[in-house]
Swiss-Prot record:
Sites where the protein binds L-tyrosine: Y34, Y171, Q175
Xref: NCBIfam families: tyrS
Record field: catalytic activity: tRNA(Tyr) + L-tyrosine + ATP = L-tyrosyl-tRNA(Tyr) + AMP + diphosphate + H(+)
Top-level EC class: ligase
Name of the protein in question: Tyrosine--tRNA ligase
HAMAP family registered for this protein in UniProt: Tyr_tRNA_synth_type1
Its EC number(s): 6.1.1.1
Keywords: Aminoacyl-tRNA synthetase, ATP-binding, Cytoplasm, Ligase, Nucleotide-binding, Protein biosynthesis, RNA-binding
MF annotations from Gene Ontology: ATP binding; RNA binding; tyrosine-tRNA ligase activity
Coiled coil: none
PANTHER family given in the database record: TYROSINE--TRNA LIGASE, MITOCHONDRIAL (PTHR11766:SF0), TYROSYL-TRNA SYNTHETASE (PTHR11766)
Organism: Neisseria meningitidis serogroup A / serotype 4A (strain DSM 15465 / Z2491)
Length: 431
């Protein structure tokens, strides 16, 4: 199966230019292709995964991937289908983000062998180009009429109170020149990107043909949608980042576990390197079992291992199991740090707090009266163990102090997992 056929079978092709010619070229020879990543934050998020993994799929098929980080274009920001003008970031901020994203992209690709990946930065050429060169050598090849007819531009112009600045209007010229430059430097003949990049990609194809007299191609990947119509890649806490310091491996693992049955088999095709035959077998087995599908677990394991590694996957599984177990002794200090980052609602507490106060503080009870009822009915657990009276000498005017949180409840001297009922948790972080 060719790489194009594999992408088609996974539903990963939204649009292409001359797919027959591209498929024939890929079958005849090994090519160089690229995808651009603008630094709009200090980390990539799961919305970037399809193009990143597509580069990897092409490399596994023997082709040379080029990961282009937009040190120059990131200073402006892509206006495509954005409702309003982007805020401009300082050169120092963008430079820091460029380095972070370069480091994140590196593990996905191999930089050794005959088709070793290439890391590029468009600041290397735009940083040396002056305004007159830009207008003479690039600008003259672009029709303003054609640019105004782009859907992404028309939406901005037609939106009341929005409009588009010349800075953002000129973005497609910069991205278009990236293709021509990478074609000249590295022989790149294919640009891939998200479906919102189609206009920019075709602009680059046309410019490369004009400047270099070369036939090149474009391929876009689909917009990832969920069956319920909500946006993919967002949680109540915001974006799901690939940086473990912004989204913990535990929370990352949980995100994939919660994928709906209606989406999970599509996402296995989109995001994993399991074969179509393996995915079809998983789906058939799930449908025949009549029990909870295994697909979500497989997806969560594959994705967490791919992004964070085997050790992080094991930690995510250990945390997931321990939260609902009586014995939480297997949790490490690093596990608690993940929970404090984004795994559980975290609350700072001080010595002397009792269980009733902790339940109300964390929102696990709406009142002291309700909290006492939970404690009396043995519905409250501390680190997996039932909360019990441990302070017989408490003051008569403070009856709730009969059940105090003490040093013995502090894991690593800092953390206590408070649980009410089967599924309601909070993390107490001791000052």
């Amino acid at each position: 199966m060719s790489v194009i056929q594999d992408l088609q079978s996974r539903g990963l092709i939204a649009q292409t230019t001359d797919i027959e010619a591209l498929d024939a070229l890929l079958n005849e020879q090994k090519i160089a292709l690229y995808c651009g990543f603008d630094p709009t934050a200090d980390s990539l998020h799961i919305g970037h995964l399809l193009p990143v993994l597509a580069l990897r799929r092409f490399q596994q098929a023997g082709h040379t991937p080029i990961a282009l980080v937009g040190g120059a274009t990131g200073m402006i920001g892509d206006p495509s289908f954005k409702a309003a003008e982007r805020s401009l970031n300082s050169a120092e901020t963008v430079a820091g983000w460029v380095e972070s994203i370069r480091n994140q992209l590196t593990p996905f690709l191999s930089f050794e062998g005959g088709n070793a990946a290439i890391m590029a930065n468009n600041a290397d050429w735009f940083g040396k180009m002056n305004c007159l060169d830009f207008l003479r050598d690039i600008g003259k090849h672009f029709s303003v009429n054609a640019m105004l007819n782009k859907e992404s531009v028309k939406q901005r112009i037609d939106r009341d109170g929005a409009g588009i600045s010349f800075t953002e209007f000129a973005y497609s010229l910069l991205q278009g020149y990236d293709f021509a430059e990478l074609n000249k430097r590295h022989g790149a003949v294919l640009e891939i990107g998200g479906s919102d990049q189609w206009g920019n990609i075709t602009a680059g194809i046309d410019l490369t043909r004009r400047l270099n007299q070369k036939q090149v191609f474009g391929l876009t990947l689909p917009l990832v949608t969920k069956s319920d119509g909500t946006k993919f890649g967002k949680t109540e806490g915001g974006a799901v980042w690939l940086n473990a310091k912004k989204t913990s491996p535990y929370q990352f693992y949980q995100f994939w576990l919660k994928v709906a049955d209606a989406d999970v088999y599509k996402f296995l095709k989109y995001f994993t390197f399991l074969s179509i035959e393996e995915i079809d077998a998983i789906e058939a087995k799930d449908k025949a079992s009549g029990t909870k599908p295994e697909a979500q677990r497989i997806l969560a394991e594959e994705m967490t291992r791919l992004i964070h590694g085997e050790a992080a996957l094991q930690a995510a599984q250990r945390i997931s199991e321990s939260l609902f177990a009586e014995d939480q002794s297997s949790l490490t200090e690093s596990d608690f740090e993940q929970l404090a980052l984004d795994g559980l609602p975290a609350f700072e507490v001080s010595d002397g707090i009792n269980v009733v106060e902790a339940l109300v503080k964390t929102g696990l009870a709406s009142s002291n009266k309700e909290a006492r009822g939970f404690v009396n009915s043995k519905a409250v657990l501390l680190n997996g163990k039932p909360a019990e009276a441990n302070n017989p000498n408490h003051a008569a005017e403070r009856p709730d102090d009969a059940c105090l949180l003490t040093d013995e409840h502090k894991r690593f001297g800092k953390y206590t997992i408070l649980r009410r009922g089967k599924r309601n948790h909070a993390l107490l972080v001791w000052k």
